[in-house]
Swiss-Prot record:
Protein's UniProt keywords contain Cell wall biogenesis/degradation: no
Annotated keywords: Acyltransferase, Amino-acid biosynthesis, Cytoplasm, Methionine biosynthesis, Transferase
Domain (AB hydrolase-1) ranges: 51-361
GO biological process, alphabetically ordered: homoserine metabolic process; methionine biosynthetic process
The protein's name: Homoserine O-succinyltransferase
Pathway: Amino-acid biosynthesis; L-methionine biosynthesis via de novo pathway; O-succinyl-L-homoserine from L-homoserine: step 1/1
Gene name of the encoded protein: metXS
């Protein structure tokens, strides 16, 4: 952490935890009899309780969206670019909540948690959950925090899918949806990427059928490979060319003619894989990819997205990025058209950038200024 915190940082933050004893029915037909949700908050809830914002995290995210946990922290929260005083999600005006979703590995109940029935980690016995399950658990968190209505539910990628599901399932409990770099469902190609990632983990000899905790080991190679594959899909060809090109690491630009790391891009991907293993759980990664695969709100409406969104009451802001080939702009435009079919209020921005899918995490001026302007409008609307 820098010696002096930036003026636009929320600073040192604390995580909180709530325990829920009421069983949570799940889409898979099972239920969680009890569970914990870990979350962080930034800013102050106003007297009218009208300025609350829910941030939903993506696959590898957590409740730690902004700020630092201690002075020893090397990096701030995952959305530091957009959350803080004067930033798009302005913590001088909004009360911001971000929770680690069920099935996660950062404190909320998930595969690495102890199963009260067996007194061992859940591992593969943890139920597969859906975006809708997450939204229902988040609604219970809102109840516990005394928040009847969110000023907005905001998220990028998988987080944006949760925001859309909120508008469908709880239309009267949010004023706005901000969904960034999102899609109404995964394509066959995206499901294919997820399956390759899962196979990398499932076939690692150290996976042990998901019970690697009991073997005091971790499927490091499989999880690292899954992350390397995922990371390629989060970048664009242009971004990788600009960052790495065909640069070699050493040896005066000469090939080694072996399978050691030679290209800078190889070194980068291996580093991303190794560092990810130290902060993420393989069973959670498997679960998160399935959550993505299963998201398809139109499926219950004869695959008619317009019908799925017919009863939403929230206003929408959708933002896509030109070089995002994982969830390209056309996928956001599908949602725009479905909302327009229902004469719902919608704002849409397509940002020209070479940053790929991960652009939603970056401080790209056109993106952050549009995001900030929209959120300022919400602040005025709720008197924040």
């Amino acid at each position: 952490m820098p010696k002096h915190l930036p003026a636009d940082s929320v600073g040192i933050v604390e995580q909180h935890s709530l325990h829920f004893d009421e069983p949570l029915p799940l889409d898979c037909g099972r239920s969680l009899p009890a569970y914990d949700l870990v979350y962080e908050t930034y800013g102050e809830l106003n007297a009218e309780r009208s300025n609350a914002i829910l941030i939903c995290h993506a696959l590898s995210g957590s409740h730690h969206a902004a700020g630092y946990h201690s002075e020893e922290d090397r990096k701030p929260g995952w959305w530091e670019a957009c959350v803080g005083p004067g930033k798009p999600i302005d913590t001088d005006r909004f009360y911001v909540v971000c929770c680690n979703n069920l099935g996660g590995c950062h404190g909320s109940t998930g595969p690495s948690s102890i199963n009260p029935e067996t007194h061992r980690p859940y591992g593969p016995d943890f139920p597969l959950v859906t975006v809708r399950d997450w939204v229902h658990s988040q609604a219970r968190l809102a109840d516990a925090l005394g928040i009847e209505r969110w000023a907005a539910v905001v998220g990028g990628s998988l987080g944006g899918m949760q925001a859309i599901q909120w508008a469908i399932d709880y239309p009267d409990r949010l004023g706005h949806v901000v969904a960034i770099a999102v899609a109404p469902r995964l394509s066959a190609q995206n499901i294919g990427f997820n399956e390759v990632a899962r196979q990398a983990i499932l076939t690692d000899p150290e996976f042990h059928g998901g019970r690697y905790y009991e073997h005091h080991t971790v499927p490091r190679r499989g999880l690292a490979l899954a992350r390397m594959l995922g990371h390629i899909t989060y970048l664009s060809d242009d971004a990788m060319r600009d960052k790495f090109g065909r640069d070699l690491r050493a040896d005066g630009g000469r090939y080694k003619f072996n399978f050691d790391v030679e290209f800078e891009v190889e070194s980068y991907l291996r580093y991303q894989g190794r560092s990810f293993v130290d902060r993420f759980d393989a069973n959670t990664y498997l679960l998160m990819t399935k959550v993505l695969d299963y998201f398809d709100p139109a499926a219950e409406y004869d695959h008619d997205l317009s019908a799925a969104l017919a009863h939403v009451q929230a206003r929408f802001l959708l933002i896509s990025f030109s070089s995002d080939w994982r969830f390209p702009p056309e996928r956001s435009r599908e949602i725009v058209r479905a909302l327009e079919d229902n004469q719902k209020p919608i704002s849409y921005l397509e940002v020209e950038t070479s940053q790929g899918h991960d652009a939603f995490l970056k401080p790209i001026p056109v993106y952050t200024e549009a995001f900030r302007a929209y959120m300022q409008g919400i602040a005025r609307e709720v008197g924040a």
